[in-house]
Design a protein with these regions (language model features):
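Positively charged n-region of N-terminal signal peptides that target proteins for export
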Residues: 1-5
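A generic structural motif
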Residues: 50-56, 81-83, 101-103, 157-159, ...
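Short hydrophobic/aromatic-rich beta-strand segments that constitute the beta-sheet cores
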Residues: 47, 75-80, 98-102, 108-110, ...
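Flexible, processing/modification-adjacent segments and terminal tails
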Residues: 22-36, 40-43, 50, 94-166, ...
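Gly/Pro-enriched, hydrophobic low-complexity segments
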Residues: 149-252
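Short amphipathic beta-strand and strand-loop transition segments with alternating hydrophobic
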Residues: 67-68, 138-145, 198-204
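Bacterial N-terminal signal peptides
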Residues: 7-17
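N-terminal, post-signal-peptide region of Sec/Tat-exported proteins
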Residues: 45-77, 81-83
Length: 264
């Protein structure tokens, strides 16, 4: 009986970590690479973001913004540039705190990584580095196809409480460690959000190449409306352009910068 149990546990471990013909170390290395690909610790980053939210039966809402990131110090700034009624609003993460600035009353209010960006289906944390390897434990990893892409499908459970979602599924392409799809789950296993990243742009800077999503589609699996006989969910598409890895002035990562830009 003991031999049967030992064999069963070994088979389970083998299926979880070597479904790809790899050992647990190589699976973990791929997850670490996927995490590293979401961050730019050796350089500043800036880009223009176009955020389009679509609510079933209500049409689309457009937000345009410029984002600045300095990942090595966990600082980022988002300046909203459109539409005109939203222009001048901004977000700032510094010293472990996220602030929202509204130029209409010149006030900063505290917000969090889990809060929605401009009332869309994107979290504030979606614009920052993702710590899948650091904050999650691998429950399983298996070799799968996502369209024509050869991927590893990771099922992850949070190791800490300070995460947006306690359970994740990640589709990571084996050849480059890029995330192509993500599903966010509650602790009970309910699907909350689905994110698709179909393509990346390669940007060179100082002889280094960085992979940045061309666009991301976030589907909120809790917020939707039945139209006819079909359930349609809210969705937000984020497109990224004008990417640069040039150094950004230190003042950009301050409250005074948002105040100054809000007055323009």
């Amino acid at each position: 009986m003991n031999k049967i149990l030992v064999s069963w546990y070994f088979a389970l471990f083998f299926c979880v970590f070597t479904a790809l013909g790899q050992d647990s170390g190589s699976v973990e290395s791929l997850l670490k690479l996927a995490q590293d690909n979401t961050a730019f610790f050796d350089t500043d980053f800036s880009g223009r973001y176009t955020v389009v939210q679509e609510k079933p039966g209500e049409g689309k809402n457009l937000t345009e913004a410029i984002m600045y990131r300095r990942d090595k110090t966990s600082q980022w700034t988002i300046l909203v540039t459109g539409p005109s009624r939203e222009k001048g609003k901004g977000y700032l993460q510094t010293d472990g705190t996220i602030w929202f600035y509204d130029p209409s009353d010149r006030r900063f209010t505290f917000t969090s990584a889990r809060d929605k960006f401009q009332n869309t289906n994107a979290n504030n944390s979606d614009f920052a580095p993702q710590f899948y390897y650091r904050d999650y434990q691998i429950e399983s990893a298996q070799d799968v196809k996502l369209g024509a892409l050869d991927c590893v499908l990771f099922t992850l459970n949070a190791k800490i409480d300070r995460v947006d979602y306690p359970k994740l599924k990640l589709w990571v392409t084996k050849k480059d460690g890029l995330i192509r799809k993500k599903e966010d789950y509650s602790l009970s296993g309910q699907l909350l959000r689905t994110t698709a990243i179909p393509s990346y742009q390669i940007v060179e800077n100082n002889e280094r190449k960085y992979s940045v999503p061309v666009s991301m589609l976030i589907v909120d699996n809790l917020r939707g409306k039945r139209i006819g006989e079909k359930m349609q969910y809210e969705r937000t598409q984020i497109s990224i352009s004008n990417v640069s890895f040039s150094k950004v002035d230190n003042v950009v990562y301050t409250k005074s910068y948002l105040e100054m830009m809000g007055d323009l």
